Amino acid sequence: MPGQGFDMNELMRQAQQMQTQMAQAQEQLAHETVEASAGGGLVTVKATGTGEITEIKIDPKAIDPDDPEMLEDVVLAAVNEALRSAQNLAQSKLGGLAGGLGLPGL
């Protein structure tokens, strides 16, 4: 409608630009690494910004044949922390892109 300032072509251009920026940000995230550790550094986990676990290091001191549950808990804690870090990284990279269209709720 004339006079309301709504330009569908401009909206489509912005959407395409945002899609390109999103793809670039996701590509960057795939190449960025976060690291987390648990158990005082006995277990260290690395993950990409997209949440793919790329490495788990376990200090031999963490391996107690009489208490495998302790190692399981420490590995789980380190993995969860690495995934949280990856999510935070992704949010910081991608979070501002949705607002680019100026639409409420995005």
Residue ranges and their predicted role:
Residues 67, 72-86:
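Short, well-ordered alpha-helical segments
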Residues 8, 60, 73-74:
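Generic detector of well-ordered alpha-helical packing
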Residues 41-44, 55, 77, 84, ...:
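Alpha-helix boundary/capping detector
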Residues 15, 51, 75:
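Residue-level signature of catalytic and energy-coupling elements of molecular machines
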Residues 31, 37-56:
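N-terminal intrinsically disordered, cationic/polar leader segments
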Residues 56-68:
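A short interface-forming secondary-structure element
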Residues 1-35, 82-106:
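Long amphipathic alpha-helical segments used for membrane anchoring, targeting, substrate engagement
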Residues 27, 51-53, 63, 84:
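Generic secondary-structure boundary signal with a strong preference for alpha-helix termini
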